[in-house]
């Protein structure tokens, strides 16, 4: 039976990152066992159309002169908006926003941030602490902080930003993080006033205290999002909808400001009022945005004045360049695509029922063990391999000669004689590849509801579904940031899955500093996921970025979080 399902689902294993995340084009790609996309003529023709559409065919850049204190970068994308809180609001499903987040990292800074090594480091807060119960997090601002125009940065500016993010008119996946704050969700739903939210301003506006509803040991990691950077209420109030539209209508809290915005071009200058300005080496960074393949990329990379460029390896022509620009770094990241089961729906509260549905929906992709993507490592070892070895078996459903028997067992345990119609919510541009199979192999009737990505987020938050499509865009490098989604009180636990042992393991992993302990408990948590099936994992999309740079460029680094590039340390050898 499974082989039949696998044949029906042959083309379903990987979804194409470039299209699902761009949300613009429908494109089918062939794939390899590792999840990277192979190139073919159809793929390249469609891709060239995207190139022409996004960046304009043969568009010529007037590249600025490369000087010792000027860095000229060719980037894949430029942001659609320069309003930090709206980074992922306009098109939250669009990969453009996620890949261009590294530009925002230069313009804005929050209480804490992630450095080039993936570690949480002080940002505008010089220190922070939390109590033993992990429900109160206190952040102490640095002395004398200023925005780019010299206006003091105060603790209340962070409160303004957080409350703005809790405005239901702003649809960003990262808003869910703020539901962890006491009465954060209630404020979002209009049930309480701002003064009832667990945000306190202390110490003469130099300290902010965030009170959580439940203990979260890794809350500081969640607060590294650029959307949580400060917002001056007076400045924002005067501009209203004009805020962030042009460089002059932005207050910058990061190491750079926008000097000018041109056609596919962004000119940045050092923010002299940034607290750590003396350690920022480049006075100017010129970013040229676009998307290239083959000859187009080669032509741009060879342009006089370009210091570095980042490209997708899948579409990078490896023809030797006529200059001294060389490949120096390569990094694979990716996205996870899955469907969440609403465990509050009686028929989906049983693991056997979920496992049977998962087996049919995911088909051959379900051969992967657990939830964490195959390319993720921990402690120098492949995480999925460790978890599968520890679990000793793949999904139990594959050991049944007839998956229908597994479904019937689950229904019997629930005292249900017949499967009800399931409401499956998917994105409006997604393809329904499972309704026919669910009916054919399990006798389950399905109602498919297609919605916009924003409505998908809203329905997820309201738990208005039986099964709902979800994805993690440009995934994380740490397994815990995947597995924490199924912790009972996680803001991303849309299916209300709850397992006390699982919660305990994730809590230990979030608090321990021993990598061996962390690895052990996360593997155990993955084993629980594999047994309980709170979601149907449809696979993952892996993509590899490549940096090409000229000799003498230092400090530029590919990172799997907060965009794709770490640009703060860029400098040139003298």
What are the residue ranges of the model-derived segments?
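Extracytoplasmic/peripheral linker and loop segments enriched in polar/acidic and small residues
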Residues: 51-52, 64, 394-396, 447-456, ...
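Alpha-helical secondary-structure segments
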Residues: 72, 154-161, 205-211, 255, ...
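N-terminal lobe/hinge region of extracytoplasmic solute-binding protein
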Residues: 74-132, 163, 251
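Surface-exposed binding/hinge segments that line
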Residues: 129, 140, 173-234
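Gly/Pro-rich hinge or "lid" segments in bacterial periplasmic/extracellular proteins
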Residues: 212-280, 284, 295
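Extracellular/periplasmic solute-recognition and catalytic clefts
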Residues: 259-267, 286-344
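Structural transition elements
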Residues: 365-410, 426-430
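Long beta-strand-rich cores associated with HINT superfamily self-processing modules
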Residues: 547-574
């Amino acid at each position: 039976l499974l082989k039949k399902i696998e044949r029906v689902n042959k083309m379903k294993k990987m979804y194409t990152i470039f299209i699902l995340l761009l949300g613009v084009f429908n494109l089918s790609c062939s794939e390899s066992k590792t999840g990277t996309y192979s190139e073919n003529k159809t793929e390249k023709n469609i891709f060239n159309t995207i190139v022409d559409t996004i960046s304009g065919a043969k568009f010529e850049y007037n590249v600025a002169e490369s000087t010792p204190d000027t860095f000229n970068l060719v980037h894949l994308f430029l942001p659609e908006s320069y309003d930090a809180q709206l980074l992922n609001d306009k098109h939250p499903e669009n990969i453009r926003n996620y890949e261009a987040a590294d530009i925002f990292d230069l313009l804005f800074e929050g209480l804490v941030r992630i450095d080039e090594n993936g570690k949480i480091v002080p940002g505008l807060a010089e220190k922070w602490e939390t109590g033993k119960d992990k429900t109160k997090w206190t952040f102490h601002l640095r002395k004398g902080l200023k925005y780019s125009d010299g206006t003091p940065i105060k603790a209340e500016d962070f409160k303004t930003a957080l409350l703005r993010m809790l405005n239901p008119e702003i649809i960003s996946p990262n808003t869910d993080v703020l539901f962890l704050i006491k009465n954060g969700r209630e404020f979002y739903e209009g049930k309480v006033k701002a003064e009832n939210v667990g945000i306190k301003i202390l110490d003469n506006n130099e300290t902010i205290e965030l009170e959580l509803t439940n203990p979260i040991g890794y809350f500081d990691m969640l607060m590294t999002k650029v959307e949580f950077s400060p917002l001056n209420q007076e400045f924002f109030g005067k501009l209203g909808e004009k805020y962030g539209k042009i460089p002059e209508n932005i207050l910058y809290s990061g190491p750079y400001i926008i000097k000018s915005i041109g056609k596919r071009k962004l000119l940045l200058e050092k923010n002299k009022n940034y607290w750590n300005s003396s350690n920022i080496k480049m006075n100017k960074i010129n970013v040229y945005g676009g998307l290239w393949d083959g000859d187009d990329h080669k032509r741009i990379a060879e342009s006089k004045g370009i210091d570095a460029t980042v490209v997708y390896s899948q579409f990078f022509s490896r023809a030797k360049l006529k200059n001294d620009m060389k490949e120096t770094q390569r990094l694979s990241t990716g996205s996870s695509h899955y469907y969440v089961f609403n465990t509050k729906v009686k028929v989906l509260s049983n693991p056997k029922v979920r496992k049977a549905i998962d087996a049919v929906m995911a088909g051959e992709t379900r051969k992967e063990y657990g939830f964490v993507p195959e390319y993720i490592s921990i402690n120098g070892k492949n995480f999925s391999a460790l978890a599968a070895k520890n679990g000793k078996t793949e999904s139990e459903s594959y050991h049944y000669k007839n998956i229908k028997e597994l479904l019937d067992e689950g229904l019997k345990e629930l005292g249900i004689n017949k499967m009800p119609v399931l409401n499956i919510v998917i994105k409006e541009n997604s393809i329904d590849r499972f309704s026919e199979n669910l009916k054919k192999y399990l006798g389950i009737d399905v109602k498919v509801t297609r919605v916009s990505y924003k409505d998908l987020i809203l329905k997820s938050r309201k738990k208005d579904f039986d099964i709902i499509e979800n994805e993690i865009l440009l995934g994380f490098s740490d397994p815990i940031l995947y597995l924490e989604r199924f912790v009972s009180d996680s803001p991303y636990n849309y299916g209300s899955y709850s397992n006390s042992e699982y919660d305990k393991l994730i809590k230990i992993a979030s608090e321990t500093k021993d990598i061996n302990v962390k690895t052990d408990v996360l593997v155990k948590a993955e084993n629980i996921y594999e047994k309980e099936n709170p979601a149907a994992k449809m696979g993952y999309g892996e993509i590899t970025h490549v940096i090409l740079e000229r000799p003498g460029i230092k400090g530029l680094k590919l990172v799997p979080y907060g965009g794709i590039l770490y640009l703060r340390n860029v400098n040139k050898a003298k």
